[in-house]
């Protein structure tokens, strides 16, 4: 192992006493320096050690090495064509030994046809005009203390449950001042059982929470990354919501109207959005523009929008994912906004939803005395 580390530092032009962490240096490697089979094999061994990979046999390891090499070549080619320093970067993250097809099967849902869900939700949604006059230049709910730490969904396509709990956690924290981690496992067990589907939507979670008097905390109903029998009736203490709203792009919508709706909503609270995430496989940072998105109509994942910003004139959303803090920007992805595309990047404008919750009496009393619910001054 020591030899491999020294080889890596030598190829990077770094000393062995460099303060750059092994994890970060692997992600930020200039892969043009790793072109021979021997160099790639040595890098693979270092990557395996970093991520604790152990394969069943030599055949499996050889297969994973070949995939790792193909991914390395793809990363090198894509990074060489980045449009600006702020464009998204790819790297040898923890998914570097699986193919795009394996990644989709393991971490994403089966593609969803959003048209039927839009028809169903349109029957329930409240029609209203959204406007957002003079919004702050940037916004980040993480700085307001209403976002729990990044979680890891494991090898299953249940991003919908994590996006839903994240939205409820934030709504509850904004309304009560109490940030608590909620149970994705309860949603996995109970929503899937009641819906008869393993391909859920975030709004189905909100409906279930409303109908069953709340959602359990993660401590009371911990995550197991597999479905089980619903135990909701055994949990007494619940976090409740008062309703939910949907943001749906209709045939009459314009890109500007959709942007206004999202801005208006996110300044009130984080929102859950659906997206085609196949191209998130090797993302390590920067503003994702969706140029290689396979289909804006085939939704297969859900993330939580927690804010927005801009870099050198390029606007982006800040989205919390559920693949652990060691993916992307410490578990987050920046997704370009104001692209001029009505559908948004990878279809994210199609279908968004968020729970609603009234403020507690304590916070209402404080606001009456002159304290605003949320300070919307620029961050």
From Swiss-Prot:
Protein name in UniProt: P34 probable thiol protease
Family membership noted in the UniProt record: Belongs to the peptidase C1 family.
Main EC class the enzyme belongs to: hydrolase
Annotated keywords: Disulfide bond, Glycoprotein, Hydrolase, Protease, Signal, Thiol protease, Vacuole, Zymogen
Active-site residues, as the UniProt record annotates them: 301, 321
GO CC annotation terms, alphabetical: extracellular space; lysosome
Propeptide: 24-122
Claim: Cell membrane is one of the keywords in the record: no
Signal peptide, first to last residue: 1-23
Cell location: Vacuole
SMART domains hit by this protein: Inhibitor_I29, Pept_C1
Enzyme Commission code(s) on record: 3.4.22.-
Species name: Glycine max
GO biological process, one term: proteolysis involved in protein catabolic process
Post-translational modification: N-glycosylated on its propeptide.
Assembly information from the UniProt record: Homodimer; disulfide-linked.
CDD domains linked to this entry: Peptidase_C1A (cd02248)
GO MF assignments: cysteine-type endopeptidase activity
Pfam families noted in UniProt: Inhibitor_I29, Peptidase_C1
Site feature Ancestral active site, where: 200
Positions annotated with a glycan in the UniProt record: 70, 292
């Amino acid at each position: 192992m020591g030899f491999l580390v020294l080889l890596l530092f030598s190829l990077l032009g770094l000393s062995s006493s460099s303060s750059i962490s092994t994890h970060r240096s692997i992600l930020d490697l200039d892969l043009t320096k790793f072109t021979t089979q021997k160099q790639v094999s040595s890098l693979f061994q270092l990557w395996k050690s970093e991520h604790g990979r152990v394969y069943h046999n030599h055949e499996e390891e050889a297969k994973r090495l070949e995939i790792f090499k193909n991914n390395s070549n793809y990363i090198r080619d894509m990074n060489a064509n980045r449009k600006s320093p702020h464009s998204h970067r790819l790297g040898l993250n923890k998914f570097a030994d699986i193919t795009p097809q394996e990644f989709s099967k393991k971490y994403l849902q089966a593609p969803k046809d959003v048209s039927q869900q839009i028809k169903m939700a349109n029957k329930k949604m409240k029609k209203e005009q959204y406007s957002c006059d003079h919004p702050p230049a940037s916004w980040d709910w993480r700085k307001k203390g209403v976002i729990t730490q990044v979680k890891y969904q494991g090898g299953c396509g249940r991003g919908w449950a994590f996006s839903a709990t994240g939205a409820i956690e934030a709504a509850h924290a904004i309304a009560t001042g109490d940030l608590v981690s909620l149970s994705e496992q309860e949603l996995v067990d109970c929503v899937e059982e009641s819906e008869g589907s393993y391909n859920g939507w975030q709004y189905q979670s909100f409906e279930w929470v409303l109908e069953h008097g709340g959602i359990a905390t993660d401590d009371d109903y911990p995550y197991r990354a597999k479905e089980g029998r619903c135990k909701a009736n055994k949990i007494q203490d619940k976090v409740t919501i008062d309703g939910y709203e949907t943001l749906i792009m209709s045939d009459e919508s314009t890109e500007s109207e959709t942007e206004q709706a999202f801005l208006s909503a996110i300044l009130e609270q984080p929102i859950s959005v659906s997206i085609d995430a196949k191209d998130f496989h090797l993302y390590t940072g920067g503003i994702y523009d969706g140029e290689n998105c396979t289909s804006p109509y085939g939704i297969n994942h859900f993330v939580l929008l927690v804010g927005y910003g801009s870099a050198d004139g390029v606007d982006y959303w800040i989205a919390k994912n559920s693949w652990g803090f060691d993916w992307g920007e410490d578990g987050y992805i920046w997704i370009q906004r104001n692209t001029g595309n009505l559908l948004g990047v990878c279809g994210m404008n199609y279908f968004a939803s968020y729970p609603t919750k009234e403020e507690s009496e304590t916070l209402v009393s404080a606001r009456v005395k002159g304290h605003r619910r949320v300070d919307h001054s620029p961050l």
